[in-house]
Structure formats: structure tokens, C-alpha cells
Amino acid sequence: ELLGIGEFTDSAFSKYRNSAFFTVENGKALNGKIENVKRFAKIGVRIMTLTWNEMNEIGSGVLSEDKCGLTDFGKLAVAEMEKYGIVIDISHASDELFYDVVNQTNKPFIATHSDSRTITQNPRNLTDEQIKIIIQRGGLIGLNLHNAFLNNNPDKACMNDVLKHCEYMLSLGCDKRLI
């Protein structure tokens, strides 16, 4: 069953034990055209990652030289995403983009594949404050199993590192927000 726009909620997760969502990873797929948000929503896209590490029309990724946050187009895009029920994914976003999303949006947003920056000091990971904001806004966080995000020495990454990130996020209040 395809969930309708706006049905991305806790009750949807409890009703459907096994779920899949149509997603777009990298808002660059909008091609700088705001009307593409509506088009993606109509074909069933429910989640969109705003950037993929680098700068795009929406804003700055974690590896962008220019850490501008959301662009003017990006501000329009996140408003349209909220309007059409596409959940914003801030994985790959710069810190500036993250906080612009906090200030420009009202609905929960998510980080589908991000770990704790306290455990592994990688700028791609989330700070404690960012984790707490996602929780407070009713969003979700999914762990990332990439070695470089799990351990400061990626060659040594193992399952224990996954557990460390999981336990740490749970200690910050992610008990119902960690996927």
C-alpha cells in the first residue's frame, strides 16, 4: 500500500512493520525547477535528501567550500516539500544548511543515514545538538554503516562501533526516533 501525502507518521510505522519509501538522494534532481517538487510528490516520492555532500541549487553540502546554508531556491524548495508531503532528509547537509532547515520549516525532518559526531569526529555526522533538535521536532535518525562514519580509524570499524553510536543516540533520547 502506498502511503498518501502526509501519512509519514509514527502510526504509519506502527501499522506497517515492513515499509519502503520512495526517496530522492540529492535535491539536484529538481534541476532548479520548483515545480519538480510537486511532480516528485505525485509519483510517490516521500523523502528527499537536500544535497549529496557538495553544493547544489538547494544549498551547501557538508563538503562544500561555500557553507551558505539554504539558497533562495532552497528556501522555496523546502517550503514546497512541506506543502506536498515530502519529508526533508538532512543527511549530507552542511551545519549551516541544517540550521537553515530548522529555521525555515515547521514539520519533522529526518537524517536517514547519519551517525554521532561525538563518537566519530566526521563532519558528515550529527552533533548532539542536531540529534536533539531532530528528536524535538519529531523526526527520525537512521544509522550509517560506512566505516569512515563509525570509527575515527575507519580500518578498525566493526559492529561494536555501530552499537556505540546506537547506545549513544539512545542516551540522548532517540529511543523512539532511531531507525
Q: What spans do the regions from the language model cover?
A:
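Short, acidic/polar
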Residues: 30-40, 165
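A short, acidic, amphipathic alpha-helical segment used as a generic capping/interface helix at domain edges
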Residues: 162-172
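Short acidic/histidine-rich active-site segments
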Residues: 144-145, 172-179
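Acidic (Asp/Glu)-rich catalytic clusters
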Residues: 1-3, 8-15, 38-45, 101-105, ...
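Metal-dependent enolase-superfamily TIM-barrel catalytic cores that perform enediolate-based chemistry
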Residues: 39-95
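Charged helix-capping and loop-helix junction motifs
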Residues: 71-73, 123-129, 158-164
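A metal-dependent hydrolase metal-coordination microenvironment
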Residues: 1-34, 62-83
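Catalytic core of soluble alpha/beta enzymes
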Residues: 57, 95-154
